[in-house]
């Protein structure tokens, strides 16, 4: 089966400023993709800012700095209000109903992928990519979410609600690798 990594050319990478999303950018560049980066600014707390008076959190600055070093465009999307309304409020509501919420599952489907795909469309990207350790295969014209090859890093559980629309446009380059310490 051919891998999705060689089908299209332009990909929008969700960049956290961390090692995994940075590795994704470099891997996709090495594979010949035109890479663009985006950081979703979802939540600010004081520990996100290393310098008093700093206008943007460290992870945004780190993602932008990496994008500059890789010579790729970088965008920041401020979605703090929507994150509070969509993900945080749902988390609170579930606790008030005496349920155990899983905010990552809700965030990925109803929040991250929504914004990443909307921005990918706006920027005319064929795919989005993230640093999640999961894989996507195709069988009988259906996309199937599978566990990442590294059992210690597998993140497919947090992505289980993604549907065909989302999976058909998503790349997980790290899902086929083992994370080194």
Q: Over which residues does each language-model region extend?
A:
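ATP-dependent adenylation/nucleotidyltransferase module used to activate substrates
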Residues: 1-161, 171, 177-181
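A short, charged helix-loop
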Residues: 165-169
């Amino acid at each position: 089966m051919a891998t999705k990594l060689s089908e299209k050319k332009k990909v929008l990478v969700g960049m956290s400023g961390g090692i995994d999303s940075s590795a994704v950018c470099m891997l996709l560049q090495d594979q010949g993709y035109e890479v663009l980066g985006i950081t979703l600014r979802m939540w600010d707390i004081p520990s996100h800012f290393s310098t008093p008076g700093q206008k943007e959190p460290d992870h945004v600055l780190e993602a932008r700095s990496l994008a500059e070093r890789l010579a790729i465009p970088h965008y920041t999307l401020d979605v703090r209000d929507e994150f509070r309304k969509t993900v945080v409020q749902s988390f609170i509501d579930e606790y008030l109903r005496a349920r155990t919420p899983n905010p990552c599952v809700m965030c990925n489907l109803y929040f991250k992928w929504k914004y990443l795909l909307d921005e990918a469309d706006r920027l005319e990207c064929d795919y989005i990519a993230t640093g999640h350790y999961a894989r996507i295969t195709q069988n009988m014209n259906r996309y199937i979410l599978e566990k990442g090859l590294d059992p210690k890093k597998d993140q497919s559980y947090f992505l289980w609600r993604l549907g065909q629309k989302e999976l058909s446009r998503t790349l997980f380059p790290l899902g086929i690798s083992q994370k080194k310490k």
